[in-house]
Amino acid sequence: MSRLLLVRHGDTEGNSAERYWGHTDVKLSAAGLRQAELLRQRLAMEKIDAIYASDLERATVTAQTIAAGRSQLVITLPDLREINFGELEGLNFTEVGKQYPEIARLWRERRMSLRYPGGESIEELDGRVSQFRRRLEKHGAGETVLIVAHSATLRLLMCQLLGLPSQHWWQFRLDLASLTVMGTYPAGAILNLLNDVCHLEGGK
């Protein structure tokens, strides 16, 4: 069995405003930096053999904070980026509904094929995640791998590992700075811990 530690990046100014940042390279907020440090403390006793992160700063800095004092380098990959919202980047859902009513309608229907103007679709993001999943296959039994990325990216990865149709990705909840733990076996994967944020209690 290999063990996967899935971490969603910490808070950003954009997340506080409930805006869609996608590929926009926003920084962690002061709260997000504190969350990353609390994650480091939470995982301090874990043996971690490899660390992967999205190459967007909010994920990279979260991963680097967790990795502080370890010998492993953080491997940053564009395949782990959040979905590209294109023209919708920086907008909130109310603004999207006013400016792009048809896009908002299709989003509510969870259309996998919906491509954001100037951006990408969930199907295309799912393809990126598949490429990363193949990279994970090189890690052997007994290894623990930390993956720091974004909400949709991690949820699609979970679906793929669990053998679930990717259209169910939105039915998992992953909060900011949350920890999810999975075990992978030749016959499939097991979800051991989902969306755990106990490390944030009293530390926000």
PLM-predicted stretches and their roles:
Residues 1-2, 75, 85-98, 138-144, ...:
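Acidic, low-complexity terminal tails and accessory targeting/binding regions
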Residues 5-66, 115-130:
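Loop-to-helix element that buttresses phosphate recognition and phosphoryl-transfer chemistry
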Residues 10, 151, 197:
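Active-site metal-binding loops of divalent metal-dependent hydrolases
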Residues 36, 100, 111, 129-133, ...:
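Short amphipathic alpha-helical/adjacent loop interface patches that line ligand
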Residues 37-105:
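Phosphate-coordination/substrate-recognition cap region in phosphate-metabolizing enzymes
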